[in-house]
Amino acid sequence: PFLGKDLKKSNLEKQNITFGYADRFDEKYDLVRSVRKGKYKYIRNYQPFNVDGIYNFYRYKMLAYKEWYSLFKEGKLNKIQSQFFLPRTPEALYDIEEDPHEINNLAKLKKHKETLLNLRETLNNHVVSQPDLSFFPEPYFLENGLENAVDFGQKNKKIIQSLVETANLNLYPYKDVSSEIKNALENENPWVRYWGLIVCSSFGIDAKEHLNKINSIFENDSENLVKIRAAEYLLLNNLKIDSSKINNLLKNAN
Protein backbone atom coordinates (compact mmCIF):
# COMPACT_ATOMS: atom_id res chain seq x y z
CA PRO A 1 0.00 0.00 0.00
CA PHE A 2 2.88 2.44 0.56
CA LEU A 3 3.52 2.45 -3.20
CA GLY A 4 0.31 4.41 -3.81
CA LYS A 5 -2.61 3.80 -6.13
CA ASP A 6 -0.89 4.66 -9.40
CA LEU A 7 2.23 2.51 -9.06
CA LYS A 8 2.00 -1.18 -9.83
CA LYS A 9 4.51 -3.74 -8.61
CA SER A 10 5.05 -4.98 -12.17
CA ASN A 11 6.07 -1.48 -13.28
CA LEU A 12 8.34 -1.08 -10.28
CA GLU A 13 10.14 -4.32 -11.07
CA LYS A 14 11.04 -2.96 -14.50
CA GLN A 15 12.92 -0.06 -12.95
CA ASN A 16 16.70 -0.26 -13.09
CA ILE A 17 17.49 3.01 -11.38
CA THR A 18 17.18 4.30 -7.82
CA PHE A 19 17.90 7.76 -6.42
CA GLY A 20 19.15 8.37 -2.88
CA TYR A 21 18.96 11.46 -0.72
CA ALA A 22 20.48 12.62 2.58
CA ASP A 23 20.41 16.03 4.23
CA ARG A 24 20.01 16.40 7.96
CA PHE A 25 19.71 13.97 10.84
CA ASP A 26 19.23 15.89 14.08
CA GLU A 27 22.18 18.30 14.25
CA LYS A 28 24.21 16.35 11.66
CA TYR A 29 23.85 18.19 8.36
CA ASP A 30 25.31 17.07 5.07
CA LEU A 31 24.20 17.23 1.44
CA VAL A 32 24.58 13.90 -0.35
CA ARG A 33 22.74 12.56 -3.37
CA SER A 34 23.13 9.23 -5.13
CA VAL A 35 21.92 7.19 -8.05
CA ARG A 36 22.17 3.46 -8.59
CA LYS A 37 21.79 1.87 -11.99
CA GLY A 38 22.33 -1.85 -12.27
CA LYS A 39 25.34 -2.83 -10.22
CA TYR A 40 26.87 0.65 -10.04
CA LYS A 41 26.14 3.28 -7.43
CA TYR A 42 27.25 6.88 -7.89
CA ILE A 43 27.42 9.17 -4.85
CA ARG A 44 27.71 12.95 -5.01
CA ASN A 45 29.20 14.52 -1.87
CA TYR A 46 28.44 18.21 -2.28
CA GLN A 47 30.35 19.03 0.91
CA PRO A 48 33.23 16.55 0.71
CA PHE A 49 35.15 18.16 3.57
CA ASN A 50 32.54 16.64 5.88
CA VAL A 51 33.37 13.18 7.17
CA ASP A 52 30.94 10.29 7.49
CA GLY A 53 31.63 10.36 11.21
CA ILE A 54 30.47 13.98 11.51
CA TYR A 55 29.44 14.77 15.07
CA ASN A 56 26.07 13.72 16.45
CA PHE A 57 25.62 14.09 20.19
CA TYR A 58 23.72 10.85 20.69
CA ARG A 59 25.98 8.57 18.69
CA TYR A 60 29.19 9.76 20.30
CA LYS A 61 27.65 8.76 23.62
CA MET A 62 27.68 5.18 22.33
CA LEU A 63 30.65 3.14 23.53
CA ALA A 64 31.31 1.62 20.10
CA TYR A 65 31.59 5.06 18.49
CA LYS A 66 33.80 6.34 21.27
CA GLU A 67 36.17 3.42 20.89
CA TRP A 68 36.18 3.63 17.09
CA TYR A 69 37.05 7.33 17.16
CA SER A 70 39.67 6.86 19.89
CA LEU A 71 41.38 4.17 17.84
CA PHE A 72 41.33 6.49 14.82
CA LYS A 73 42.97 9.34 16.77
CA GLU A 74 45.58 6.91 18.08
CA GLY A 75 46.39 5.75 14.54
CA LYS A 76 45.37 2.18 15.26
CA LEU A 77 42.88 1.75 12.41
CA ASN A 78 43.77 0.48 8.96
CA LYS A 79 43.06 2.43 5.78
CA ILE A 80 39.57 0.99 5.30
CA GLN A 81 38.56 1.45 8.94
CA SER A 82 39.80 5.06 8.90
CA GLN A 83 37.66 6.14 5.94
CA PHE A 84 34.74 6.97 8.22
CA PHE A 85 36.68 9.84 9.82
CA LEU A 86 38.42 11.26 6.75
CA PRO A 87 37.20 13.84 4.20
CA ARG A 88 35.58 12.31 1.16
CA THR A 89 35.90 12.90 -2.56
CA PRO A 90 33.24 15.05 -4.29
CA GLU A 91 32.00 11.97 -6.11
CA ALA A 92 32.30 8.24 -5.64
CA LEU A 93 31.49 5.19 -7.72
CA TYR A 94 31.00 1.69 -6.35
CA ASP A 95 30.34 -1.72 -7.82
CA ILE A 96 27.68 -2.84 -5.36
CA GLU A 97 27.81 -6.48 -6.43
CA GLU A 98 31.54 -6.75 -5.76
CA ASP A 99 31.72 -4.14 -3.01
CA PRO A 100 28.41 -3.99 -1.08
CA HIS A 101 29.97 -2.02 1.79
CA GLU A 102 31.13 0.76 -0.58
CA ILE A 103 34.79 0.68 0.34
CA ASN A 104 36.62 0.80 -3.01
CA ASN A 105 35.93 4.06 -4.83
CA LEU A 106 36.21 3.52 -8.60
CA ALA A 107 35.63 7.17 -9.56
CA LYS A 108 39.21 7.90 -10.60
CA LEU A 109 39.81 4.72 -12.59
CA LYS A 110 39.93 5.27 -16.36
CA LYS A 111 38.08 2.08 -17.19
CA HIS A 112 35.05 3.35 -15.24
CA LYS A 113 35.09 6.90 -16.62
CA GLU A 114 32.18 6.37 -19.01
CA THR A 115 30.02 4.88 -16.26
CA LEU A 116 30.98 7.72 -13.93
CA LEU A 117 30.10 10.44 -16.42
CA ASN A 118 26.81 8.80 -17.38
CA LEU A 119 25.68 8.46 -13.78
CA ARG A 120 26.92 11.95 -12.94
CA GLU A 121 24.75 13.34 -15.72
CA THR A 122 21.76 11.22 -14.71
CA LEU A 123 21.92 12.43 -11.13
CA ASN A 124 22.54 16.04 -12.05
CA ASN A 125 19.57 16.08 -14.41
CA HIS A 126 17.41 14.61 -11.65
CA VAL A 127 18.56 17.20 -9.10
CA VAL A 128 17.87 20.10 -11.47
CA SER A 129 14.57 18.79 -12.79
CA GLN A 130 12.94 18.26 -9.40
CA PRO A 131 14.23 20.93 -8.52
CA ASP A 132 16.18 20.00 -5.38
CA LEU A 133 15.19 22.56 -2.74
CA SER A 134 18.09 21.72 -0.43
CA PHE A 135 20.45 23.91 -2.42
CA PHE A 136 18.88 26.75 -0.48
CA PRO A 137 20.00 26.81 3.16
CA GLU A 138 17.39 25.23 5.38
CA PRO A 139 16.53 28.40 7.39
CA TYR A 140 15.89 30.31 4.16
CA PHE A 141 13.62 27.57 2.84
CA LEU A 142 11.69 27.31 6.10
CA GLU A 143 11.02 31.04 6.04
CA ASN A 144 10.24 31.37 2.34
CA GLY A 145 9.19 28.02 0.92
CA LEU A 146 7.66 25.78 3.55
CA GLU A 147 4.08 26.97 3.07
CA ASN A 148 4.03 25.82 -0.56
CA ALA A 149 7.20 23.92 -1.37
CA VAL A 150 6.12 22.90 -4.89
CA ASP A 151 5.30 26.46 -5.91
CA PHE A 152 8.50 27.75 -4.30
CA GLY A 153 10.56 25.19 -6.20
CA GLN A 154 9.02 25.99 -9.56
CA LYS A 155 9.39 29.75 -9.08
CA ASN A 156 13.05 29.31 -8.15
CA LYS A 157 13.96 26.57 -10.62
CA LYS A 158 16.44 28.69 -12.60
CA ILE A 159 18.09 29.97 -9.44
CA ILE A 160 18.44 26.43 -8.10
CA GLN A 161 20.03 25.38 -11.39
CA SER A 162 22.62 28.15 -10.99
CA LEU A 163 23.32 26.98 -7.43
CA VAL A 164 23.82 23.41 -8.65
CA GLU A 165 26.17 24.65 -11.37
CA THR A 166 28.19 26.52 -8.75
CA ALA A 167 28.26 23.48 -6.46
CA ASN A 168 29.52 21.35 -9.35
CA LEU A 169 32.70 23.40 -9.68
CA ASN A 170 34.32 21.10 -7.13
CA LEU A 171 34.13 18.24 -9.65
CA TYR A 172 36.92 19.76 -11.72
CA PRO A 173 40.62 20.55 -11.21
CA TYR A 174 40.99 23.77 -9.23
CA LYS A 175 43.02 25.59 -11.87
CA ASP A 176 40.24 25.01 -14.41
CA VAL A 177 37.54 26.64 -12.28
CA SER A 178 39.37 29.29 -10.25
CA SER A 179 37.94 32.18 -12.26
CA GLU A 180 34.42 30.77 -11.98
CA ILE A 181 34.85 30.49 -8.21
CA LYS A 182 35.90 34.15 -8.15
CA ASN A 183 32.75 35.08 -10.04
CA ALA A 184 30.63 33.06 -7.63
CA LEU A 185 32.13 34.82 -4.60
CA GLU A 186 31.33 38.17 -6.21
CA ASN A 187 27.80 37.24 -7.32
CA GLU A 188 24.94 39.45 -6.18
CA ASN A 189 22.88 36.40 -5.20
CA PRO A 190 23.87 35.46 -1.62
CA TRP A 191 23.24 31.76 -2.20
CA VAL A 192 25.62 31.68 -5.16
CA ARG A 193 28.22 33.21 -2.83
CA TYR A 194 27.22 30.62 -0.23
CA TRP A 195 27.93 27.77 -2.65
CA GLY A 196 31.08 29.46 -3.91
CA LEU A 197 32.40 29.30 -0.36
CA ILE A 198 31.45 25.64 0.00
CA VAL A 199 33.41 24.96 -3.19
CA CYS A 200 36.39 26.83 -1.71
CA SER A 201 36.21 24.62 1.37
CA SER A 202 36.11 21.59 -0.92
CA PHE A 203 39.42 22.63 -2.46
CA GLY A 204 40.94 23.56 0.89
CA ILE A 205 44.15 25.55 0.92
CA ASP A 206 44.35 25.39 -2.89
CA ALA A 207 41.66 28.09 -2.90
CA LYS A 208 43.74 30.44 -0.75
CA GLU A 209 44.09 32.90 -3.63
CA HIS A 210 40.52 33.93 -2.79
CA LEU A 211 41.40 34.57 0.86
CA ASN A 212 41.00 38.36 0.69
CA LYS A 213 37.50 37.97 -0.72
CA ILE A 214 36.62 35.26 1.80
CA ASN A 215 37.75 37.50 4.66
CA SER A 216 35.73 40.36 3.21
CA ILE A 217 32.63 38.16 3.07
CA PHE A 218 33.22 37.05 6.65
CA GLU A 219 33.42 40.65 7.78
CA ASN A 220 30.85 42.36 5.60
CA ASP A 221 28.37 40.07 3.86
CA SER A 222 24.70 40.96 4.26
CA GLU A 223 23.71 37.33 4.94
CA ASN A 224 24.70 35.72 8.22
CA LEU A 225 24.58 32.22 6.70
CA VAL A 226 27.06 33.28 4.02
CA LYS A 227 29.37 34.70 6.68
CA ILE A 228 29.25 31.34 8.46
CA ARG A 229 30.39 29.54 5.31
CA ALA A 230 33.29 31.99 5.04
CA ALA A 231 34.19 31.25 8.65
CA GLU A 232 33.99 27.55 7.87
CA TYR A 233 36.64 27.91 5.16
CA LEU A 234 38.96 29.81 7.51
CA LEU A 235 38.54 27.31 10.33
CA LEU A 236 38.91 24.21 8.17
CA ASN A 237 42.21 25.54 6.88
CA ASN A 238 43.54 26.77 10.25
CA LEU A 239 43.62 30.37 9.07
CA LYS A 240 43.46 33.42 11.31
CA ILE A 241 39.98 34.33 12.49
CA ASP A 242 38.56 36.48 15.29
CA SER A 243 36.81 34.07 17.65
CA SER A 244 34.64 36.84 19.13
CA LYS A 245 33.13 37.39 15.69
CA ILE A 246 32.34 33.68 15.47
CA ASN A 247 30.38 34.02 18.70
CA ASN A 248 28.45 36.96 17.27
CA LEU A 249 27.64 34.96 14.14
CA LEU A 250 26.26 32.12 16.21
CA LYS A 251 24.19 34.49 18.33
CA ASN A 252 22.64 35.90 15.17
CA ALA A 253 22.10 32.50 13.54
CA ASN A 254 18.64 31.75 12.24
Question: Which residues make up each language-model segment?
Answer:
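Generic structural signal for secondary-structure transition and capping sites
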Residues: 12-15, 40, 128, 132
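Polar, surface-exposed loop/tail segments
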Residues: 1-37, 112-121
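C-terminal, low-complexity/hydrophilic appendages and adjacent surface loops
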Residues: 25-108, 115
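Generic structural hydrophobic/aromatic packing signal, biased to beta-strands
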Residues: 7, 19, 35, 42, ...
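Short secondary-structure boundary segments
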Residues: 1-13, 56-74, 181-182, 215
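Long, internal low-complexity/basic segments
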Residues: 75-90, 98, 106-212, 216-253
